[in-house]
Structures are given as C-alpha cells and as structure tokens.
A protein has these predicted regions:
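Transmembrane helical elements of multi-pass membrane transporters/channels
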Residues: 21-40, 142, 176, 205-209, ...
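Small-residue-rich hydrophobic transmembrane alpha-helices
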Residues: 53-113, 150-169, 278-341, 378-397
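Helix-terminus/linker motif at the lipid-water interface of multi-pass membrane proteins
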Residues: 35-54, 123-130, 186-193, 253-283, ...
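Short alpha-helical transmembrane segments in multi-pass integral membrane proteins
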Residues: 1-23, 81-148, 190-246, 303-374, ...
Length: 461
C-alpha cells in the first residue's frame, strides 16, 4: 500500500481535499468500530437475552477507564507526532513511537492486574445486581485479559494515521471490525459461548489488527518506523504525550463517572431493565459520535502540522469545515432519535422475549427522544474540545471536557432523578450538552480572535 499523503503536503494541499482524504478513512473505521459494538449488543440481546445487555452496560464504566489510559497514550502520541513532523523533526517523531510501545506495555499490564483482582467489587460499585453481575463478570474477564492487545492496537493505529497513512489506518481498523463481525455469531451461537464469546471475538480481532500494525512499523516503506535505540522511555517525551493526551484521558474518566452515576440512578428508579435501555441509547449515540470522532481524527494531523508550521490561516479553515460536517452528523442522529426511537430499540431486543424486553424497548425509546433532543450542537462542542488539544493547549481542552461532565452533568444527575425518576436521568444529558456547548463557543471565539490578530505568532511545544 502506498503512502496516502506525505506529511509535507499537509501544509500545501487544499484543506477540503486533505480533510476528505484524512477524515473519510477515519470515519469509515470509527463508524465500523461503533457498528460492531452495536452488532455485539444485537447478538447478545437476541442470543443471550435482554438482561445480558444490562450486564454489558454495567461493564461500560470499566471499559471507559481502560479507554482513558489508551487515549492518554494514543491521542497524545498522535498529536505530538504530527507536530514533530510539521517541525521537520522526523527522528523525534520516531522517538515518540518507541515511547508509545513501552508505555502501553507498562500501563496495560498494571491495569489488567488491578482490574482482574478487584473485578467483582468494582462491578458491584457500578450498580450490578445478582441478576446482572454474572454477565458483566464473564464479559470483562476476557476484555481485561486482552487490555495490552487493545491498547497497543489503538495507539499504534493513531500514530499510523498521524504519520501520513490514513487509508492504512482505516484498513487495519476494518480488519478488526470484519473479523469481529465474523467471529461474534460463530462464538455466541456456533460454539455456545454466550457473552464470553462476544468478548473473545473482540480481543482476537484486535490481536489480528495489531499484527498488521507491527508489520507496518517494521517496514522500510514507513515514513517513521521501529529502529534500534528508540525503545527507551524519555521523560520529556512521556511528559508531552501525557500533557496532550490528558484531555482525552479525563474525558474518558468523566464518562465513566457519568455512567456509574447513571447506572446507579437507573437501578434505583428503573431497575436492571432501565440500565439495559441506557446501554442501547449509549450505543446509538456513540454511532454518531464516532463519526464525529472520525472527523476529529481527520482534522488532527492537518491542524497539528499547520500549527507546528505556524500556518494559522489553514488551521482556522480546517476547524470551520470540520465543525460544519460534525453538526450535520449530529443533526442526523437527532432526527433518528425523534422520528424512529422504538424501531431503533427493537433492533437490540425482541419484544416477543417477554415483559422485560417490552419494558426495555419502551424505556429506551423514551430515553432516545430526550437524550438526543439537543444533539445537533453536540458536534460543535466535541470538535472544539479536540481542537484545543490538537494545537497543544491541553488545559483548555481539559477544562471543556471536565465542565460538561463534572460541573454540569453529574450535579444534574444527582438533583433531578430523585424528583423525576428515570425522566430526570434522561433530561440531565441535553441540559448539560447545551450549557457545555455555550461555554465552548465562548472559548473558541477568543482563541480564533488571537489567531487572526497574531497570524505569525510563534508557539512552541
């Protein structure tokens, strides 16, 4: 496979062409990744039962925490790689690659050990009941066992994309997606492994994709590659990776905290069925947010390179185009949630499975309408937060990430449900989205004004 876009062209090609070239592969990959999570849930819902969906939903906080550590390394390394290439420092970019490998081994090994040791107490804290903890435990034991594979696969894929190979990054991710979709029904229905089969399919598919990534960086045709001497931790590189990736890390941690509070509230006011309904809503929303994430991934190397080269006019242009596309995506999600909520919920659960299944469908349909009611502006808020991260301003990105989850959403989740029940849980989310988007607009306004007043100002990182 030939190199899709050389780093040097990031500073000269048309922004719209670059965004399409980088974003489309990322969108396809991220959407496919979200779709196979949806397919997992559909197979689990129809092959194991509606309460099994609740068990997987209870696993989401722990999976988000695992993703937090993966994002801390992967997103930080990708942004730093783009900036180093924009500065013309190819060897420094390869040093980042070496640090990524070592950091993933250390962090993932520690997370796996702690997670497996304390799994049952963690799941009970997350809101598991006697009916759901068995499903959650069976699923997470295998997912935790594959944490090193997952972290390494996702981090290296980020660096592949950031170093000028968006199509190859897409192909690698699609490899995992296709294998997962093939293995899931085989393991769940063919081998009768149930929910453990779904987890095993995910880990094995990612292991296959990781092997392709390792081959890429071992090839002499890669712009940056594995070399002798790069596999040593450098405090300065690790510090910058963590600094840039901290916003994504905190966002995932906050997302975990939110899901924990949501699950606890739903268990109190709606029971296990309501938790499963939230699992459905979460996966539907994530389908559209993964498309926005693909747009952000396409934006990242273009922003990082041109920011490193001090081409601020191009930075603003790609930001504007990305925001427009993101708002269109989330508006589509809004329309789906308002027009076809019950039909969407029935994809995951068969109403013929009994009263619990029908209750889950009805609860999910109500939640979809409310949770997605301000979804159009969510795309803008997410792009803005990522933009600050990509230009090396992690403090602003962290602030935006924290305020939506911690300052607005969690307090609302603590205040509204005692008065409104499950309705209060659903209402908390769009209220938090609206206020966070307004705050993001204010910060972005001042940042854009700085760029326009100082078009050639230097910024080191």
């Amino acid at each position: 496979m030939k190199q899709a876009v050389t780093p040097l062209r990031l500073g000269s090609d048309r922004i719209s062409s670059l965004l399409v070239r980088y974003a489309i592969p990322s969108i396809i990959a991220m959407t496919s990744s979200s779709l196979y999570n949806i397919v997992d849930s559909i197979f689990i819902g129809h092959g194991v039962g509606p309460i099994a969906i609740s068990g997987v939903a209870l696993s989401m906080p722990l999976m988000n925490i695992a993703s937090a550590f993966g994002s801390l390394i992967g997103i930080g390394a990708a942004a730093l790689t783009s900036i180093r290439l924009g500065q013309g420092r190819r060897e420094a970019a390869e040093g980042v690659l070496g640090n990524v490998v070592l950091l993933n081994f250390l962090v993932a090994a520690l997370f796996t050990a702690v997670g497996l040791l304390l799994l049952d107490p963690i799941l009970c804290f997350f809101g598991a009941s006697d009916a759901t903890i068995g499903y959650a435990r069976d699923f997470m034991q295998i997912i935790l066992g594959g944490t090193i594979v997952t972290h390494m696969y996702l981090s290296l894929n980020e660096v592949i994309r950031a170093s000028g190979y968006p199509r190859r990054a897409m192909a690698i991710m699609l490899t995992a997606v296709v294998l997962n979709c093939l293995l899931n029904p085989l393991f769940i229905f063919g081998f009768g492994w149930g929910i453990r089969g779904s987890a095993a399919a995910t880990v094995l598919a990612q292991a296959a994709a990781l092997s392709v990534s390792l081959v890429h960086f071992s090839s002499s045709g890669s712009f940056i590659r594995f070399k002798r001497g790069i596999f040593r931790l450098q405090a300065s590189v690790v510090g910058k990776i963590f600094s840039i990736g901290m916003a994504s890390f905190l966002l995932h941690l906050c997302a975990s905290a939110v899901v924990i509070v949501v699950n606890k509230s739903l268990r109190e006011y709606g029971g296990d069925v309501a938790i499963g309904a939230y699992g459905i809503i979460y996966r539907v929303a994530m389908l559209f947010l993964m498309i926005v994430s693909g747009l952000n991934q396409g934006m990242q190397p273009i922003v990082g390179y041109n920011y490193g080269a001090r081409r601020y006019d191009r930075v603003l242009k790609v930001l504007r185009q990305t925001v427009v596309c993101a708002v269109c995506v989330t508006t589509t999600g809004f329309l789906l949630g308002q027009l076809f909520p019950r039909q969407v919920a029935m994809l995951f659960v068969d109403a013929a499975d009994g009263a619990a299944a029908e209750r889950m469908i009805s609860t999910a349909a109500e939640g979809l309408r409310i949770v997605l009611c301000v979804f159009p502006i969510v795309g803008f808020q997410i792009v803005t937060s990522n933009f600050f991260q990509y230009i090396g301003k992690p403090h602003k990105a962290i602030f935006l990430s924290l305020t939506r989850q911690m300052l607005f959403l969690i307090p609302l989740l603590l205040v509204l449900p005692p008065h409104l029940g499950t309705l209060g849980v659903w209402m908390s989310m769009p209220i938090a989205d609206g206020t966070a988007s307004l705050l993001a607009a204010v910060l972005l306004f001042y940042q854009v004004r700085k760029f326009r007043h100082r078009p050639h100002a230097e910024r080191s990182i």
